[in-house]
Regions:
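Exported/periplasmic ABC-transporter solute-binding proteins
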Residues: 15-273
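Sec-dependent N-terminal signal peptides
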Residues: 4-13
Length: 273
């Protein structure tokens, strides 16, 4: 599990015995939220010497499993719990736990910057990822095979896209499968004809396509003009207390939401700087 270390934590090791760690938080889950969660953890630890926050990706499903088993304090998730996960939580803990909306995300469609196609309709997007459209010329682009890239089934983004864009139809069987959002971007960066999807916070090396002539932007996502938006979650197995509660409260505060915005995601409300 990755530990984010800041100078403040290093300094503590050299302080007197009265300076002891005041708490630890373990977090695992959504790859979409990985960079965001790391940034939140880094900023919080810089403000709270003595707190150690461990952050790991692996996908929403993996995070939920670790939450149920008691391995982590917080599961980061880009989707809601499914019925089986909710039942497991209830069986283990006698309740469905707690969930917190911490940010909003526009699910972006990534294409190579050199691709001539810049706008895709929602209908055509579904056809691309179900193999009904297989050539860019059908969308006004070059005569080249479309290479769709999808996430692994342990990803919350995989299920969200399948439900909200594909209407629960099966993904194209020839689609490439990427383990993380960063892997999706790496493939698209090297292949002009590839297309994939992921969070709006990942801006480097790819073009975020317009969907139905609407750009994936903070304002368009906040007011739901952009057609593919979702909330990002923190799940806990019980009512949080101590340092876990303090961290979540800070994430939801104006200071925490400024980090959300800095990471490229959409704060829960408009912020004044």
């Amino acid at each position: 599990m990755k530990k984010i270390l800041l100078l403040s934590l290093i300094i503590i090791a050299g302080c007197s015995s009265s300076s002891v760690p005041i708490g630890m938080v373990k977090i695992k889950g959504s790859d979409t939220m990985l960079i965001l969660t790391e940034m939140l953890a880094e900023e919080y630890m810089s403000r709270n010497p003595g707190v150690s926050i461990y952050v790991e990706g692996g996908g929403t499903s993996a995070g939920v499993k670790s939450l149920i088993s008691g391995e982590v304090d917080i599961c980061t998730a880009s989707r809601s719990l499914n019925p089986d996960e909710a039942k497991s939580l209830a069986d283990y803990y006698g309740s469905l736990g707690m969930y917190f909306l911490i940010a909003k995300d526009a699910l972006s469609i990534y294409i190579n910057p050199d691709n001539e196609v810049k706008n895709i309709s929602s209908e055509d997007l579904k056809k691309i990822f179900t193999c009904q459209i297989t050539n860019w010329k059908e969308l006004g682009g070059n005569d080249a095979q479309i290479i769709p890239i999808i996430r692994t089934p342990n990803s919350g983004t995989y299920f969200y896209f399948k439900e909200h864009i594909l209407s629960n139809e099966d993904y194209c069987p020839t689609a490439l499968v990427a383990n993380t959002t960063e892997d999706v971007i790496k493939i698209i960066d090297k292949n002009k004809n590839a297309i994939g999807f992921g969070g709006i916070g990942y801006q480097d090396d790819v073009f975020h396509a317009y969907i139905d002539d609407i750009r994936p932007s903070e304002n368009n996502a906040r007011n739901d003009t952009y057609p593919i938006t979702r909330y990002l979650h923190f799940f806990t197995s019980k009512t949080p207390s101590g340092v876990v509660k303090n961290f979540i409260d800070w994430v939801l505060s104006p200071e925490g939401q400024k980090v959300v915005q800095k990471a490229g995601f959409i704060p829960l409300w408009e912020l004044s700087f």
